[in-house]
């Protein structure tokens, strides 16, 4: 960790385990934080794209039992196949 330069975590103050336990106001504030985080990352790192992710439940890869969201800046050629991560 971090996955790439500029990798950012958004973590709400109130403890909730997953996105689905957050109330509407918290979810709205998280989306606003995504926009602010994206702007800051773009100014500092100039990425070519982004992965934005929330893991919900152990089967989905959640290892920390507190809601958090990853904003991962991606750069051309940083991984062989950027489409591979969440496919079934």
What is each model feature region?
Residues 1-88:
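HIT superfamily nucleotide-processing domains
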């Amino acid at each position: 960790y971090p996955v790439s330069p500029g990798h950012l975590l958004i973590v709400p103050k109130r403890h909730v385990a997953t996105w689905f336990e957050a109330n509407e106001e918290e979810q709205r504030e998280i989306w606003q934080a995504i926009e602010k985080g994206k702007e800051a990352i773009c100014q500092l790192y100039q990425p070519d794209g982004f992965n934005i992710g929330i893991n919900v439940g152990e089967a989905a890869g959640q290892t920390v039992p507190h809601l958090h969201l990853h904003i991962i800046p991606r750069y051309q050629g940083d991984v062989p196949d950027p489409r591979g991560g969440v496919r079934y």
